[in-house]
C-alpha cells in the first residue's frame, strides 16, 4: 500500500531497523529475508533522500534524520495496531493479554498484589510483566514498550493520560534501639543522621529526595538500596533512619520491630500515586478494562487508609509526633 508515494511497509522496516540496529535481526523480526531488508533500506534512502543508517562493524548507526523519523513512525504504527488491527471486543475470561508495568516494590506489595489476585479470578490467562524503573519512562510510553507506569504523579509525563490511585505520606522508621533519634524529629536532626535510602534508576530521585531538593536540603545516605523492601534489614541494630511510605511502614511493623516517627513538616507533604498509559492506548479495550480494575482496587486501598493513624498507634513501633 502506498501513501503519497511511500510504501507503508517500509515504515515497518524502518521501525524494525531502529529497534534492532542489526540488519539480520531486523529482517528476522518482521519475517523478511536479509536481501529483502537490504532492498527496503535502499528504497527508504531514496524516498527520504538520506543515508538513514551507516555501518559500524555489524551495527547500524542511525543518522540524525532517522532518529528524527523514528518517534513518529513508531507512534503511527502503534495507532494502526491498536485502532485497526487489534480492535476486537475484549473478553477478559478468554484473553491471554500480557501487561507490562513499571512500578516500585512499595506499589507491588501494597497495591498490585490485590490487582493480580482479582485478575487471576476474572481473567486467568492474563499475565503481567513487572519491569524495573527506567530513567526514561516517557520514552517507553512513547514507543508503546510499556502498558502502564505506576509511580508518584510528580514524576509523570504531561503528554500522556493518567489517573489518580490514592494519596500517601511518608514517615521516618528506625530500629527501636536507635539512640540518636530524638523524641521530636526536626529537619536538622533528619538531614544530619545516617540514612538508608531507596534508589530507583541512576538519575531519577526518589520522592523524598526530590522533596528535600525542593527545599535546598540534602541528607547523609550511608546505605543506598534498589527498593524499599531492603531497607529494614539495614536499620536493625544501628542508629540509622529511613523514610518510608506509611502503608509500607505499617506492613513491615507487623513482622519487624520498628520505631515509626512523624517527619518534620512542611518538608514532606502527602503525595499522589497514579497510573499512566500511552496516549494511543486510551481507547484500547484491554487497557480500559485494566484501568478500571486499577481504580476499583485503589478505592479499596484508600478506604483502608482512613484507619491508618489508629492502626499506627498499635504497631510494634510507636509513632512519635514532633
Curated annotation (Swiss-Prot):
Domain of life where this protein originates: Bacteria
Keyword list, A-Z: Activator, DNA-binding, Nodulation, Plasmid, Repressor, Transcription, Transcription regulation
Domain HTH lysR-type residue range list: 6-63
A GO MF label: DNA binding
InterPro entries xrefs: LysR-type_TF (IPR050389), LysR_subst-bd (IPR005119), NodD_PBP2 (IPR037416), Tscrpt_reg_HTH_LysR (IPR000847), WH-like_DNA-bd_sf (IPR036388), WH_DNA-bd_sf (IPR036390)
DNA-binding region, residue intervals: 23-42
Name of a matching Pfam family: HTH_1
PANTHER family in UniProt: HTH-TYPE TRANSCRIPTIONAL REGULATOR LEUO, HTH-TYPE TRANSCRIPTIONAL REGULATOR LEUO-RELATED
Functional summary from the UniProt entry: Regulates the expression of the nod abcFE genes which encode other nodulation proteins. NodD is also a negative regulator of its own expression. Binds flavonoids as inducers.
Protein family: Belongs to the LysR transcriptional regulatory family.
Protein name: Nodulation protein D 1
Gene transcribed to yield this protein: nodD1
